[in-house]
Regions:
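Intrinsic low-complexity/disordered segments
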Residues: 2, 7-8, 24, 54
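Generic short N-terminal amphipathic or hydrophobic helices
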Residues: 22-25, 45
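Hydrophobic, low-acid, alpha-helix-prone terminal segments
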Residues: 8, 12-16, 27
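PRPP-associated nucleotide enzymes
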Residues: 5, 30, 42-234
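Cysteine-centered motifs
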Residues: 32-34
Length: 234
């Protein structure tokens, strides 16, 4: 049944591409499995299994300054909980978790005078901030240029939703060694957990409905900084 569903889903996406006649942002394709794909023209047009609709921006949750304040607070909380930064290593979940980890790393370098080693994990296909498809994420690549054994590992992601991506990242870290602790830092926790996963550090708790989408925009990928609450209009 699952195989048949996947085949049907892929066929629908192929038809949508052809009917739309547009070039799509390949990097966003895996983030928008359920809600659809956005074209590069930036008009927010969405093509999905639920039909064709428009992503409507309901509210801006954080601007650039609010995000900086939240990440600075997370930086202080991480240092306080771990009694310094000497034993820390950071792992960003690509894509947006990676630059968030780098920003916190820069903050802690100012606070403690120590640069925390940073690595990254690439989780394939499904993202907790957008996907509602109940399939397990897969590890595409883990780039950890340090030994995790005995270290306090902090995982970073932009949005925490079902917890499936975080669980996959935890499993990836354990496949590389035996850390002392694994902690989770999240910019936005939108709720709706499907697994017993809880963030140790949260920039903002944001109650949402399942029809809504939390979009974190960073200049590295989006040309702007902010957190936005979106909804799919059919």
């Amino acid at each position: 049944m699952g195989r048949l569903y996947n085949a049907a889903r892929q066929q629908v996406f192929k038809l949508r591409y052809r009917d739309a006649g547009k070039i799509f942002d390949i990097e966003r394709r895996r983030r928008c499995v359920c809600f659809g794909m956005r074209d590069l023209a930036g008009n927010g047009r969405i093509f999905s299994l639920r039909g064709v609709g428009t992503m409507h921006q309901k509210a801006q949750i954080m601007d650039e300054n609010a995000m900086k304040r939240a990440l600075m607070r997370l930086s202080h909380e991480i240092v306080e909980k771990n009694k310094g930064a000497a034993n820390l290593v950071f792992v960003g979940i690509r894509r947006r978790g990676e630059p968030i980890a780098e920003r916190v790393c820069e903050n802690i370098a100012v606070i403690e005078g120590i640069r925390v080693p940073c690595g990254s994990i690439d989780i394939k296909f499904y993202r907790d901030d957008l996907s509602t498809v109940a399939e397990s994420p897969e590890i595409r690549k883990a780039s950890l240029p340090f030994d995790v054994n005995g270290r306090d590992v902090v995982l970073f992601d932009d949005v925490l939703y079902t917890g499936r991506t975080a669980r996959a990242a935890i499993e990836a870290v354990f496949s590389c060694g035996r850390p002392k602790t694994i902690q989770l830092a999240i910019l936005v926790d939108r709720g709706h957990r499907e697994l017993p996963i809880r963030a140790d550090y949260v920039g903002k708790n944001l109650p949402t409905s399942r029809s809504e989408l939390v979009e974190v925009r960073l200049p590295e990928f989006d040309g702007e900084t902010g957190v936005f609450l979106m909804d799919l209009e059919s």
